């Protein structure tokens, strides 16, 4: 049987303690290297540039005065989310 050695190598009972520790060490080294390369990539791009929302986004108002029902003087509604929700539910 030519594949007997392969079957024996893949059997969990044939691994020695040293072999398991070696495999564990290699996995730790691999994940450490992968983590360090991901950290270096994140340092090249600042979080401000990557996560910045546009100032005129419809999800918040820069002049938020706590009046969510609207402005009685101008008839203007400050709750911009209601437009998006009405589009979703209609």
Curated annotation (Swiss-Prot):
Principal location: host cell
Keyword Transmembrane: yes
Localization: Host membrane
The entry's keywords: Host membrane, Membrane, Transmembrane, Transmembrane helix
Region feature (Disordered): 55-90
Residue stretches of biased makeup (Acidic residues): 62-74
GO cellular component: host cell membrane; membrane
Top-level taxon of origin: Viruses
Transmembrane segments: 15-34
Topological type in the membrane: Single-pass membrane protein
Amino acid composition bias (Polar residues), ranges on this chain: 80-90
Protein known as: Protein RL8A
Organism whose genome encodes this protein: Human cytomegalovirus (strain Merlin)
Gene (name only): RL8A
């Amino acid at each position: 049987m030519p594949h007997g050695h392969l079957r024996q190598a893949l059997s969990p009972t044939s691994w020695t303690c040293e072999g398991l520790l070696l495999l564990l060490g290699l996995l730790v080294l691999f994940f450490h290297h992968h983590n360090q390369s991901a950290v270096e990539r994140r340092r090249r791009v600042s979080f401000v540039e990557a996560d910045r929302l546009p100032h005129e986004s419809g999800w918040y108002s820069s002049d938020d005065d706590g009046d969510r029902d609207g402005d009685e003087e101008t008839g203007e509604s400050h709750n911009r989310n209601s437009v998006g929700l009405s589009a979703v539910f209609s």
